[in-house]
A protein has these predicted regions:
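Glycine-rich, acidic/polar active-site loops that bind/position phosphate-bearing ligands
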Residues: 1-436
């Protein structure tokens, strides 16, 4: 159901809303917001809300700093962990320059442009993300430690699983915010958890993922815990992935239903993702820590596909009807979902447009090194991934030059900081663990 600005204003008046958070992401996926009083919301809808873009990572230079937020009424939700009297609403925003032109660094806008391109090709793309996270204890000052909340394992129950009530609270909050939880369970690592929610349109799924991450962080904090979405917060435990599930539809039909021929549109779509997988990696896996996850605990390392096989980069899960889809297993939760979902879809659409043939499936366990002979591997480090993406004609055609340059510049700084740090673990804690 579409909402108008007037719908939101009526809701604010009827439901004791006092504050409205106008939320957006920097180009690296970190959520930001500015709060306005509910009485100022009509002005925000009509004139936008100006802010200093030079203070947001990857946005603007000081000499050209003004940007404008425009709230999207369709993203309205009430934050259930905030007070019930004087309630707090949140909406995601689009971003423009003061003259009304789209801002090139708005990654949400990039995803919207890819969705429009798919629509022009007669396609609808649905997306669902599976996001894992860790829960850690905090010290007497409330600062995060590296001590996991529990020592449970995959699908364990209490008393080994001590996060059951946290996941329950997360699921109820998600439901209150319009997300539909599907599954929740303890994951493989000590203190590791997963909560899955229903797929949706590409843009809504990216919005939902940001909502999910902020919800997990807030509820963990309320319970005296710290939630980490870092890909590999403990080297002796499983990494956290963010598997991206995609289905494409033409004339109401899911193209992943039934057998997928190498020369079918679904086959071309998968082929496009495989062809551009290495170029996408610095976006799917954007920090140095991301690369310690590859090749273990069901995290892929090679460019390949198969049905069901969890050692593959792309797999086709066993499903029927509307749930037939592909699953890309390389992304991790530190990524910007707008960029990643947009680039995944763009790669698949490129495969369709160029009629790329689908390679033969690889039906081997690629966690055994000998089984991977002859296969192309994903980049082994962030620096290698940046080099590949920076030389990619595909990436250059996809992303606005200012966004791309800022992104690579920031990642190169991350590489230098990590590689030159006297204590890489201490550097990682300050620059990644505490922020992701």
């Amino acid at each position: 159901m579409k909402h108008t600005a007037q719908d939101i204003l009526n809701y604010v008046e009827d439901n004791d809303v006092k504050f409205v958070r106008l939320a957006f992401c920097d180009i690296f996926g970190n959520q930001k917001n500015i709060s306005v009083f509910a009485g100022d919301l009509p002005y925000a809808f009509e004139q936008g809300v100006c802010f200093d873009g030079s203070s947001i990572a990857g946005f603007m230079n000081t000499e050209e700093s003004d940007l404008v937020l425009w709230p999207d009424p369709d993203t309205m939700t009430i934050l259930p962990w905030r007070p019930t009297e004087g309630r707090v609403m949140r909406m995601y925003c689009d971003i423009t320059l003061p003259n009304g032109r789209p801002f090139a660094g708005n990654s949400r806008g990039y995803l919207q442009s890819v969705v429009k391109r798919a629509k022009a090709m007669g396609l609808r793309c649905d997306v669902g993300c599976e996001c894992e996270f860790y829960l850690f204890q905090t010290d007497e000052h409330g600062n995060p430690t590296r001590i996991p909340m529990d020592h449970g394992g995959y699908f364990d129950i209490a008393p080994l699983d001590k996060a059951e009530n946290i996941r329950r609270e997360i699921c109820f909050a998600m439901e209150d915010m319009g997300l539909r939880p599907q599954h929740s369970h303890h994951e493989s690592g000590f203190g590791q958890n997963e909560v899955d929610f229903m797929y949706s349109t590409a843009l809504k799924s990216a919005d939902n993922l940001n909502t999910f991450k902020s919800t997990v962080k807030a509820i963990a904090d309320r319970n005296g815990l710290f939630a980490s979405f870092m890909p590999k917060p403990m080297q002796d435990q499983a990494g956290s992935g963010m598997h991206v599930n995609v289905s494409i539809h033409r004339d109401g039909k899911n193209l992943f239903q039934g057998d997928i021929a190498p020369d079918s549109e679904a086959g071309h779509f998968i082929a496009g993702i495989l062809a551009h997988a290495r170029e996408l990696t610095c976006f799917c896996n954007p920090i140095p820590n991301s690369y310690t996850r590859f090749g273990s605990c069901e995290a892929p390392k090679y460019v390949s596909w198969s049905r069901q096989n969890r050692s593959q980069l792309v797999r086709l899960p066993s499903a029927t009807g509307e749930f037939c889809r592909l699953e890309l297993r390389s992304p991790d939760p530190s990524c910007n979902p707008y960029l990643v979902i947009g680039l995944i879809l763009a790669a698949g659409l490129d495969g369709i447009e160029k009629e790329m043939p689908l390679p033969a499936p690889v039906n081997r366990n690629l966690f055994h090194k000998s089984a991977a002979e002859g296969l192309e591997s994903l980049p082994e480090s962030l620096r290698e991934a940046i080099t590949i993406a920076a030389q990619s004609d595909f990436i250059a055609k996809q992303l606005p030059v200012p966004l791309m340059n800022k992104y690579f510049e920031y990642q190169t700084q991350l590489c230098h900081g990590y590689e030159s740090a006297p204590d890489p673990q201490a550097w990682e804690r300050e620059n990644c663990f505490l922020k992701i």
